[in-house]
């Protein structure tokens, strides 16, 4: 067992901890959710903080080199080896570098001993056997610089400048993991090896393996691969600071045309080492309650019809182990910063002066109790990822996860202490004084009067008297009686899948699939006829506001009232518009299933369309449109639709005035008939009793007035969508950095009605992705991530697209284009080799094999089990069809669809010429 000296608590008994003689630590947890899967993580306590001035970016560069050659795995073979075993690069095989640590990640699609052995072998290669071939370093340098170039956006630059302002002396402010162009360009094999040998030592390494394995088998495999790793002294861990505690009075203005107007005020205090004790957990709970109550007050203001700010955050947090920092952040519409920051400061001071009301405390304790109860009920089916996160909390010395059962017991012990007085005391003790704060303004244009004017407003807001808060009453939920329960007119079960399908007399369809995959969890999905097919060339934004339907509340409750009414209940309702349906989804518990169905039925039968639901969205439009085209990706997303559709308004961004003209009256006119009359299919997947679920649906949706029994065909031209006949190169411009460019090729294909063609195009996209990655990334070092995708519509007749592309340096635009064309021509001429096909196919087959191991996978089959039986059959046959595809089939598909001469080519280049 490891030393957990700073905690009063013991971890759950199911954990297995160990340490090899060389100092390497490991954590093992057996878990069968999802069954027969596992994950392997290796974390090295080495990040960008460990870099010397001339090594900035080296921790991240070394992470890249882990995939580029080691003693027993030649350069480029690690990813190929994993693909052959069913792990997709990026999805199942990945790594990340932060300021304090680097983590390598493998998600195993099967929990078999051979795959585990391979995974640990590869981790061991990364830990102690990297070769750092000079030519490999040179190639990967291009990839790392490409990643840096891609990430060099207005958002990252704003973050970096903000760190430098608030923590000017801190090492962390100068150690972004991506590094600098100068140090990366100068990096060589010797320098990277020196960093790796210094920082990658057993004593600073933790292995975490969670999954459907016997712990003894895992322990033996760890020893087999890592016991011979030679121990070396751990390097000193640099401090992330220093941070000047009494640094008030400074101010700064930072401008960028893509930024939202934002004011941040902050003060720093000394870092406090808080041991993991019962008393500290109690205080943490009180701080959480206080923070949520303050957030709730600010949320209420933001939901008003005329919100004083666009976004807001407040709180006190650690800056590594160097300081504590209290910050208030207010984002506003252009020129509205005085109102925004004044309002937020007023609410913050009201909280710290008077504390919460009893009603506010009651609302948050109800939410907390439910969260702890739900976690306890789901304890037996926690995911691999959940356990991995807990393992690293232990490994990093942050706290000891005590498990949902003990957590609930602890909460019950502390619940009586959650009083307004105790919450106020905890918040006051946590905050640092804002008497003379640091102030930073960021936005498009400087404030009138400069930073001095901002300080005058902040100073006034910090000194003005504030009134105490008022407590309000909580209403009863008004939607519990929908009339006479509906009668069942059809009740069947789909063989093999076990999905029960029912139809009520009013036309509502119900599909049920009970599972034991996640204890105490029920997924609910409503599929309603309509969607974007309701839009037209004359009304291209008809259903644009659908995601904001819930923001308008209900006829008898505002959204804010609902939040208080539903406190302590696991319910919710999101709405979205698909191509031909509307979808509302939620995850609840068996205890709250009745209320969940009542809430969804209420939104269907009595949406409120209250104007406050649009306030924040309407005020975000200016900033949204100001950011369009500020990065290559943004410029592409803006220009792609009109190019491919010949400016069909349905697939083209409309002017800002068109969005500003939208309101709930127009949404009601567009979707009101569908809410009232459209065909409706309800699906439940998870931990529930079938008969009880049927009874509850009968009382809610089954009791609604009769509605259409079939989803509409929409055969009056709504399904027509064209791909431009123009075959040329289009040039778009972006407002980002002068070295950033983006290249895309698009081809028209077909819809998904031909299953063989659709399956083949899916696999071909994966093959092309591998081929482009091998060429552009591994051989030429031109891009961080190549792209290949295929999309066959199930809505628009004969419509589909195939796309390839990459983000590249402007100077490499021509070379990248030649390489991409050559890659496609090679596949057309010779077809992919068998190894490439299997590397593409195996991860796809593993994903298909694991579909029935999660409720989400089952929902894909259950959601439209009655209205789309052919799609269900298609999904069931997908593995068989994928397995039958040959290299010759893929060659034929490439020849049929991917002629480079017939592509639409889009180049996105800087608006300003490169220097």
Model-derived segments and their meaning:
Residues 130-131:
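Penicillin-binding protein/beta-lactamase superfamily catalytic region
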Residues 13-14, 91, 194, 497-498, ...:
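Residue-level marker for the onset of beta-strands and adjacent loop->beta junctions
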Residues 65-73:
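Metal-associated gating/positioning segment near the N- to mid-region
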Residues 1-28, 206, 214-280, 284-285, ...:
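Proteolytic maturation boundary segments
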Residues 183-223, 653, 659-704:
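Internal metal/ion-chelating core segments
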Residues 136-204, 208-222, 231-233, 241, ...:
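Hydrophobic, small-residue-rich alpha-helical packing segments that form membrane-like cores
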Residues 27-29, 34-51, 57-61, 76-125, ...:
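M16 family metallopeptidases and their MPP-like homologs
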């Amino acid at each position: 067992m490891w030393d957990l000296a700073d905690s009063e608590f013991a971890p759950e008994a199911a954990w297995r901890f160990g340490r090899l003689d060389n100092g390497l630590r490991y954590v093992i947890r057996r878990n069968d959710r999802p069954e027969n899967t596992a994950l392997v993580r290796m974390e090295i306590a080495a990040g960008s903080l460990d870099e010397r001035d001339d090594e900035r970016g080296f921790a991240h560069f070394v992470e890249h080199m882990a995939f580029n050659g080691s003693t027993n795995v030649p350069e480029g073979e690690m990813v190929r080896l994993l693909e052959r075993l069913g792990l997709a690069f990026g999805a199942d095989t990945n790594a990340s570098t932060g300021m304090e640590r680097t983590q390598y990640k493998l998600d195993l699609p099967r929990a078999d001993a051979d795959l585990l052995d391979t995974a640990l072998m590869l981790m061991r290669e990364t830990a102690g056997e990297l070769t750092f071939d000079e030519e490999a370093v040179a190639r990967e340098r291009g990839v790392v610089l490409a990643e840096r170039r891609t990430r060099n956006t207005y958002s990252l630059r704003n973050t970096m400048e903000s760190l430098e302002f608030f923590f000017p002396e801190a090492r962390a402010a100068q150690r972004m993991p991506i590094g600098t162009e100068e140090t990366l360009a100068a990096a060589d094999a010797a320098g990277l090896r020196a960093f790796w040998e210094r920082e990658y030592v057993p004593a600073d390494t933790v292995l975490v393996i969670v999954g459907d394995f016997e712990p003894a088998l895992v322990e033996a495999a760890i020893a087999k691969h890592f016991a011979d790793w030679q121990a070396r002294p751990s390097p000193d861990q640099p401090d992330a600071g220093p941070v000047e505690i009494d640094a008030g009075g400074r101010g700064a203005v930072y401008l960028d045309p893509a930024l939202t107007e934002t004011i941040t005020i902050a003060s720093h205090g000394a870092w406090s080492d808080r041991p993991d004790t019962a008393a500290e957990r109690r205080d943490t709970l009180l701080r959480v309650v206080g923070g949520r109550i303050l957030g709730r007050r600010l949320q209420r203001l933001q939901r008003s019809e005329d919100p004083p700010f666009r976004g807001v955050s407040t709180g006190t947090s650690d800056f590594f182990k160097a300081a504590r920092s209290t910050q208030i952040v207010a984002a506003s519409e252009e020129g509205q910063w005085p109102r925004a920051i004044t309002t937020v400061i007023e609410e913050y001071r009201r909280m710290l002066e008077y504390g919460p009301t009893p009603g506010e405390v009651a609302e948050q304790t109800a939410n907390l109790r439910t969260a702890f109860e739900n976690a306890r009920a789901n304890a037996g089916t926690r995911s691999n990822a959940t356990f991995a996160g807990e393992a690293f909390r232990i490994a990093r010395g942050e706290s000891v996860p005590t498990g949902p059962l003990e957590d609930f017991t602890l909460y019950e012990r502390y619940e009586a202490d959650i009083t307004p007085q105790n919450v106020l005391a905890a918040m006051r003790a946590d905050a640092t004084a804002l008497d003379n704060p640091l102030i930073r303004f960021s936005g498009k244009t400087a404030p009138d009067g400069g930073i001095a004017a901002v300080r005058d407003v902040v100073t006034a807001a910090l000194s003005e008297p504030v009134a105490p808060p008022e407590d309000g009453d909580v209403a009863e939920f008004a939607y519990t009686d929908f009339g006479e329960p509906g009668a069942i007119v059809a009740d069947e079960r789909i063989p093999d899948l076990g999905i029960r399908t029912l139809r009520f007399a009013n036309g509502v369809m119900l599909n049920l699939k009970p599972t034991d995959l996640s204890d105490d969890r029920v997924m609910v999905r409503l599929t309603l006829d309509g969607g974007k097919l309701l839009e037209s060339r004359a009304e291209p934004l008809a259903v644009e506001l659908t995601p904001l339907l819930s923001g308008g509340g209900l006829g008898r409750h505002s959204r804010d009232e609902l939040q208080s009414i539903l406190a302590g209940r696991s319910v919710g309702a999101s709405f979205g518009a698909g191509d031909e349906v509307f979808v509302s989804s939620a995850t609840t518990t068996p205890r709250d299933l009745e209320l969940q169905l009542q809430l969804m039925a209420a939104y269907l039968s009595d949406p409120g369309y209250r104007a406050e639901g649009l306030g924040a969205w309407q005020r975000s439009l200016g900033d949204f449109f100001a950011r369009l085209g500020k990065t290559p990706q943004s410029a592409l997303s803006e220009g792609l639709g009109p190019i491919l559709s010949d400016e069909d308004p349905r697939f083209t961004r409309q002017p800002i005035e068109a969005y500003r003209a939208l309101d709930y009256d127009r949404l009601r006119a567009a979707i009101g008939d569908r809410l009232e009359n459209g065909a409706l299919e309800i699906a439940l997947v998870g931990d529930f009793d079938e008969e009880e679920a049927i009874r509850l649906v009968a009382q809610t949706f089954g009791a609604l007035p009769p509605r259409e029994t079939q989803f509409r065909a929409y055969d009056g031209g709504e399904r027509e969508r064209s791909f431009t006949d123009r075959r040329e190169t289009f040039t778009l411009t972006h407002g980002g950095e002068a070295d950033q460019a983006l290249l895309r090729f698009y081809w028209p294909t077909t819809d998904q009605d031909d299953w063989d063609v659709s399956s083949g195009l899916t696999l071909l996209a994966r093959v092309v992705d591998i081929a482009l990655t091998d060429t552009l990334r591994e051989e030429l070092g031109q891009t961080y991530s190549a792209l290949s995708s295929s999309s066959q519509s199930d809505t628009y007749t004969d419509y589909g697209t195939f796309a390839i592309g990459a983000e590249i340096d402007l100077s490499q635009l021509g070379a990248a284009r030649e390489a991409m064309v050559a890659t496609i021509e090679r596949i057309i001429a010779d077809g992919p080799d068998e190894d490439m096909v299997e590397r593409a196919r195996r991860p796809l087959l593993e994903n298909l094999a694991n579909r029935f191991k999660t409720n989400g996978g089952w929902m894909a089959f259950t959601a439209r089990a009655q209205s789309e039986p052919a799609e269900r059959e298609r999904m069931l046959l997908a593995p068989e069809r994928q397995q039958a595809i040959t290299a010759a089939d893929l060659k034929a598909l490439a020849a049929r669809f991917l002629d480079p001469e017939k592509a639409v080519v889009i180049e996105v280049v800087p608006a300003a010429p490169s220097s």
